[in-house]
Amino acid sequence: MRHCDALVDLHTGSFHRTNIPQLRADMTNEQVIQLVHGFGGMIVLHNPGARGSLRRAAAEAGVPTVTLEAGEPMRIQADVVEDGVERILTLMTNMGIYKRSYYWTDVAPVYLNSRWVRTDQGGLLISDVEVGDKIKPGDLLGKVVDPINNLEFPMHSPFEGQVIGMALNQVVMPGYAVYHIGIAATEKSLEIGPGDSSASGENGGAQPSDLREFD
């Protein structure tokens, strides 16, 4: 892969989950930052990638690489596919590979941190939010209903940010990761340097599997 100018790894959410179209990228790598700009306006989650992953190995070999995450697995979602095609064509246009008269340039957020909100209860998950929704601390995300006694256990957001991924309505067990929240960056958190993974969601109290398991 060392002969490549750049790589884009296309992903869906993991089983029983969905993602809003987004890029996973190491935003401390200047070459990767330039590649991200080529997509136009698109949500970006700063994350250097798991060791051994294609994205991280390629970047360490000097090939700028991002992961484009979108939609659900095992389904043909025409709107998600069309969105992904537009993003790739925009990148190709900006790289001079493909010619067309327009491309997207809307501003989109870069999230330097993210966390999964997990349920403490088992039962039937019923969500009140959708991917892409902006949230603040205390907002109701959804509830888990005990099918035996119909008791409802609400799930509230402890963070301010945006729902960038989430579990589909389903049967869940205690500890199940349900809502992936892109955390709104503060001015201080924007001051990251090369090799700093503390803003990627891999540290700071999150379980090691919180990001790696569902990338």
List the predicted regions and their residue ranges.
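Structured catalytic-domain cores with a bias toward divalent-metal coordination
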Residues: M1-D215
